[in-house]
Each structure stands twice: as structure tokens, then as C-alpha cells.
Amino acid sequence: MGNLRLESSPETIVGGWGFEEDILTALGEADKLVAAEGNQFWFTGFYDQLPGVDVPDPESLELVRTDDWSLRTEVLYELDPDLFATDPNRFISYYGADGGDISEINDSIGPFFGNASRRKRGDDWPTWPGGESYAYYDIPEFVSRYGALLGKSETAAAINTLYEQALQEMRSRVPPASDRPSVGLLNAQINPDNEGFFRAYNPRTEIDKAYGKKQYRDLGIVDAFEGEYDGQSGIQVDYEALLEVDPDVLVFHFGVNYRDWNGEDALRKTVEGMRDSSLGQELTAVQEDRLYVGGSAYQGPIINLFQTEMLGKQLYPNEFGEWPGEITAGELPEIPEGEQLFDREELAEILTRASEATGSQ
């Protein structure tokens, strides 16, 4: 991420896959976004519950890559953004750029400011520009660093205070391990009908600061497949493997994203296929209707707050209150005010003040 200093506040920004966009939203800077790496993964549905908070339509943002994952360098030059709020090494690892390409973009278009901390980086992860491995950051550290860069340190401090206090309160409600249900964490889009298998994720990560599965870590998920991953982040499983461990609960990771995927509700297809399957109907989670929409892995402070609250209500209703949503409803429910676990009004006030400050710059 480095120690970048800007001569003036950026007017145009390229984002990432939703994480960076959520941080920019928290700091009142989202209206400066002109492009992204993966706009389909920026889930904006939670912002609807924050009065006065507006963000760009993710589909309005240019993509910096082609459908076959090549960098659209000519588009970057046309956009001429003031800042790339993303890790340049993703451009190398994902889109086929090399160090020379990144140096040219950095020098000719705009600087990079980002850090790939969603999950553990692979052994072959690039290390531009210094050639050395670099640190991971947690969500509050990202907020503070972007806040300092964009002249929003006071906003960053307010966001982090609310965020950390709310998470502490939610973590304090988690029941003892003996009272927690076992959980299978499945990809919301991959299923036997389209791939021949389900994909079960390991909810734990080797990096404590990684944000991709943070809510599962914070709420002490009891993993039905613990010990089965052999060092991998996920495994392929069929109905027989699911029935062997028979989780009390099934959570469909990325479910909020896959509800609207290329014009289709991929989550609904996965869930309805399971409910229609004779083997699926033998699963305890299906019989007891404990199938739940899971969150996005691309979560900054705002999205993570909502997703942690959501998961707590899904797994531990006695301690967190009931989750009122039906998984195939097509939209997320609003939690009644008396059952909310963090203050929406306070959060919205911080965000709208930050946006007003941005507009007056």
C-alpha cells in the first residue's frame, strides 16, 4: 500500500472488486468512481437501509479488464483516473500485466493505493515494485490509511469507532461452542446441475487480518467439514458428502451477489435444485429450513457490519434475534429497528457528512 501522498484530492478513482468501493463509500468518496475491476461483486443493497446514502450503480462503472481477463490499457488511458484504489499486483496476477506495464500506468496515468488482503496470497504472488513480500491489513487499518490519503481522517476515526464497538457487541453475543449449530459454507452459484458438485469453503483463513470470510471467523462458526480441506480454501462435495456430515445449517457464500448474476438468480437455482433433489431433501438443513443467503467476500466496514449482523441472526437467533428473510425471496429483508444490532442512523449520519464534505472541496 505504501506511503502515497497526493498533491490534491482525486476527482476520479478506479476501484477494485467491491471492498475498496465500500471503503470509499464510508469516506464519502464513492461518487468519484469511474471504473472497477469487478463491478458485479460490489453489493450495494445494504446501502438502501442507510437514509441519505447514495452510491453509483456498479453497472455504470467501466471495467478495467476484458471478459477473458486481459487488462484494457487503452480504457485506462481514456479514463485518465487520478487514483487506482487497488493493489497493482492484482493487475499482474489476474490480468496478464507485467512490472513494466504497471510502472508505465503508475507514471503516465495515476498512482496505485491498495493491498490484496481478502485472503492469503499465493506463493507465486507478484511483489511490484520492491520485489519483497508485504503486509496484510485489516478493515480498520484500510479505513485509516484511505482516510489519511483522502483527507478524511476524522471520518475514518468515526467509522472505525462505530465499527469496532458494534463488532465487539456482536461477538459478545456468540454462544458457547457446544450450543452452536454445525455449518456448511457452500458457494451460492456452483451446484450439481451446472458443475456436477457443490463447493464447500473453509470458513477459516490462515491470515487473521484477511477480510473475505471475516464474519464467519468473528462469530465462531462451527464448520461441518473441519479437517477435510487438506490445506485448500475449499473442496468439491456431492450430496453423499453433505449427508455424511449433515450440517445443521447451510450458508451460501456470495449469495448476495449471485441473486442477480448475468440476469439470473443463481442462488435461487442452487437452493431450489437442492430442495427438489431426493438426496437434498434428506439433509437436516433442508428439512428444518435452515438455508441462508451468505455475504460477499468483498466487504469493507459497511458491508461487513450488515453481513455480521445477518449471519448472527441466521446462526444464533436466541442471542441475536430471528433472521426474517427467505433465501429465495430475491431481496434482503429490513431488520425491525428494535432488533438491529448497530445504529443505522448514526452510521448514515457519518457517511452523509463525509459526502457533504467531499462536495464542498
Regions found by a protein language model. Give the residues of each.
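Acidic/histidine-enriched, beta-strand-rich ligand/metal-binding domains
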Residues: P56-L61, E226-V237, A241, V245, ...
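Sec-exported extracytoplasmic/periplasmic mature domains
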Residues: G18-F19, T25-E29, E78-P81, N89-R90, ...
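A local structural motif
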Residues: N3, E7-P10, G52-V64, S153, ...
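Alpha-helical, coiled-coil/dimerization segments enriched in small aliphatic residues
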Residues: G196-S233
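Extracytoplasmic substrate-binding proteins
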Residues: N3, G100-G196, G294-A357
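A short, structured surface patch at a secondary-structure boundary
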Residues: W17-P111, I221-A224, N257-W261
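Loop/turn elements at helix/coil->beta-strand transitions in domains of secreted/extracellular proteins
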Residues: E11, E29-L33, D80-L83, S108-F113, ...
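Extracytoplasmic low-complexity, Pro/Thr/Ser/Ala/Gly-rich segments
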Residues: M1-D22
